[in-house]
């Protein structure tokens, strides 16, 4: 295949041999000298055995070492050496290899929320011990100063220490961040109308296709790269149709009858609330009422299980207005269940507990408060 694509020319062969030598280098210093001989750079970072080093060539020390070697050869004590051997020996005597991190942090992509204008750099952190690489985010402030970078690195990866300078960090990231990939983000789970995509934890649905998140925690959909920042809501989704139990509609009817199917229709309809509002301007509420022990909780928990979530809802009277708003904005095209709305009252009609002003929900009807 490489031959057919014209990738086996002499210059290509030299590059492959160089890459192989880097891979097989026994020590960090051997690897550093290979890179210097190839690139001619006198300062650079390099990784070896999942540790990070900084290579520096002292040109004055190199010139002095070379002169001493040549003088030793001409005066007799030093055996004859070729120019290449003299150069290599002088390099060994004039280079400094400084360990700057006991791990290897790599910038993978830049993620940005266009609505909130928040942005982060997403990094992979490899360590020299067994185990998968860890991943996490750094802010712009944390990648511009060594002290802040060191704190965040240690926060994300246990025992990971960066001991280099701010200048070394800047030069290292200058190469890593050049033309870095950009990933768009949303801060909720569910349907993104702007991208016409459902983001459901480890899976996404776009144009009728089910997609799985890649190893770097985002979805690639054509030219679009996107991810959800909402991690607190977990959906356990089974994508294997062969293992799915298809007898549940019968059990739902036997347990709850037509009322169960009405709730089911509303529940499934919530998956398309944004699309319905785009056509009809609104999507209705559903109120499930009944005597104690009639199965309201069982029905709601069952419907949630259809969406892969072990959940019932939240009690708005036990939350602040800001807390309720956070709950409403965590999802899009997924149900929001408010439970225990009816309260016993004391004589005179006053409630035992603080009540909720249900007028708060008026603008949720047309999607202005909740998606």
What are the language-model segments listed below?
Residues 8-228:
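N-terminal nucleic-acid engagement/recognition segments and initiation subdomains in replication
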Residues 199, 287, 335-337:
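Structured core elements
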Residues 204, 290-292, 340-342, 365:
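Short, flexible loop/turn elements at secondary-structure junctions
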Residues 217-318:
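P-loop NTPase catalytic core of nucleic-acid-dependent motor ATPases
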Residues 276-278, 347-350, 367-371:
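Conserved Walker
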Residues 302-354:
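AAA+/P-loop NTPase substrate/partner-engagement loops
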Residues 353-371:
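Conserved catalytic/switch belt of AAA+ P-loop NTPases
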């Amino acid at each position: 295949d490489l031959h057919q694509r014209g990738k086996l020319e002499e210059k290509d062969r030299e590059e492959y041999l160089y890459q192989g030598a880097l891979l097989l280098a026994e020590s960090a210093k051997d690897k550093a000298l290979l890179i210097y001989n190839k690139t001619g750079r006198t300062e650079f970072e390099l990784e070896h055995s999942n540790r990070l080093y900084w290579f520096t060539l002292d040109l004055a020390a190199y010139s002095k070492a070379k002169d001493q070697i040549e003088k030793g050869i001409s005066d007799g004590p030093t055996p004859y050496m070729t120019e290449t051997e003299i150069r290599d020996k002088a390099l060994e005597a004039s280079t400094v290899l400084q360990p700057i991190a006991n791990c290897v942090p790599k910038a993978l992509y830049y993620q940005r929320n266009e609505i909130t204008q928040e942005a982060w750099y997403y990094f992979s952190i490899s360590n020299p011990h067994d185990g998968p690489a860890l991943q996490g985010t750094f802010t712009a402030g944390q990648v511009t100063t060594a002290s802040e970078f060191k704190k965040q690195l240690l926060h994300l990866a246990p025992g990971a220490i960066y001991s280099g300078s701010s200048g070394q960090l800047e030069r290292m990231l200058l190469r890593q961040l050049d033309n870095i990939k950009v990933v768009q983000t949303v801060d909720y789970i569910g349907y993104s109308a702007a991208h016409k995509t459902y983001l459901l934890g480890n899976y996404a649905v776009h144009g009728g296709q089910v997609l799985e998140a890649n190893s770097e925690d985002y979805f690639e959909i054509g030219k679009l790269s996107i991810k959800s920042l909402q991690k607190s809501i977990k959906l356990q989704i089974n994508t294997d149709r062969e293992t799915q139990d298809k007898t549940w509609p019968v059990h739902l009817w036997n347990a709850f009858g037509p009322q169960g199917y009405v709730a089911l229709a509303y529940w499934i309809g919530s998956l398309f609330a944004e699309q319905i509002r785009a056509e009809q301007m609104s999507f209705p509420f559903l109120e499930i009422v009944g005597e104690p022990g009639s199965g309201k909780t069982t029905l709601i928990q069952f419907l949630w299980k259809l969406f892969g979530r072990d959940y019932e809802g939240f009690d708005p009277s036990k939350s602040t207005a800001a807390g309720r708003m956070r709950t409403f904005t965590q999802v899009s095209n997924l149900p929001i269940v408010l439970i225990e709305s009816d309260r016993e009252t004391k004589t005179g009609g006053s409630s035992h507990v603080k009540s909720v002003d249900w007028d708060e929900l008026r603008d949720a009807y047309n999607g202005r408060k909740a998606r």
